Curated annotation (Swiss-Prot):
The gene is ispF. It comes from Chlamydia felis (strain Fe/C-56) (Chlamydophila felis). This is 2-C-methyl-D-erythritol 2,4-cyclodiphosphate synthase. CDD domains: MECDP_synthase. Disulfide bonds: none annotated. Its cofactor is a divalent metal cation. A divalent metal cation binds at D23, H25, H60. It comes from the Bacteria. GO terms for biological process: isopentenyl diphosphate biosynthetic process, methylerythritol 4-phosphate pathway; terpenoid biosynthetic process. Binds 1 divalent metal cation per subunit. Pathway: Isoprenoid biosynthesis; isopentenyl diphosphate biosynthesis via DXP pathway; isopentenyl diphosphate from 1-deoxy-D-xylulose 5-phosphate: step 4/6.
Length: 176
């Protein structure tokens, strides 16, 4: 039985889809000049990440969450092509490409982010990170949740070797 086709209930006008994404990167050496960028925000007192791109794990996790909804692989496909053919390392451009992969009848309605890392200190910049995410996704600030934990030394991230991010993203799809 096809539940959607055979249901006596009317077809809903909106379908909610949930995407999940993850990314992590190891820090470069302390002497690296590459900036540490998270959610498009620069953290001055930490080295950048080992990555072809700027290493923005927050924007990368969001890209992966969108990819889990659209089935279009951005990181490892589109982003690699942008890097190798045009030298583009800006993760906000990768995120723009992920957003473009949404159908015209799909809207991002909410995003939740959690970050784990012993460094940098996230709390002073959480507000700026929320604003940057809201702006990049063209959603209200109230639709962006973000938490961070130090990891208490329990993993490589908690020991300060890198940073990890998970993202849960809700997409509303109009079916009327």
């Amino acid at each position: 039985m096809n539940a959607e086709k055979d249901s006596p209930l009317p077809k809903p006008q909106w379908v909610y889809r949930v995407g999940i994404g993850q990314d992590s990167h190891r820090f470069l050496s302390e002497s690296s000049a590459k900036p540490c960028i998270l959610a498009g925000v620069i953290f001055e007192n930490s080295p950048g990440f080992q990555a072809n791109s700027d290493g923005d794990i927050v924007f990368h996790a969001i890209c992966n969450a969108i990819s889990s909804v659209t089935h279009r692989i951005i990181l490892g496909d589109v982003a690699d092509e942008l890097f190798h053919t045009r030298g583009i390392t800006d993760s906000s451009i990768y995120l723009s490409e992920a957003i473009k992969s949404l159908k015209p009848n799909q809207l991002i309605s909410h995003v939740a982010i959690t970050i784990e890392g012993n460094r940098p200190k996230f709390l002073p910049k959480l507000s700026a990170m929320r604003q940057s995410i809201a702006s990049a996704l063209n959603i209200s600030l109230g639709s962006v949740g973000i938490t961070a934990t130090s990891g208490e030394g329990l993993s490589d991230f908690g020991c300060g070797d890198g940073v990890q991010c998970f993202c849960v993203l809700t997409v509303m799809e109009y079916c009327g």
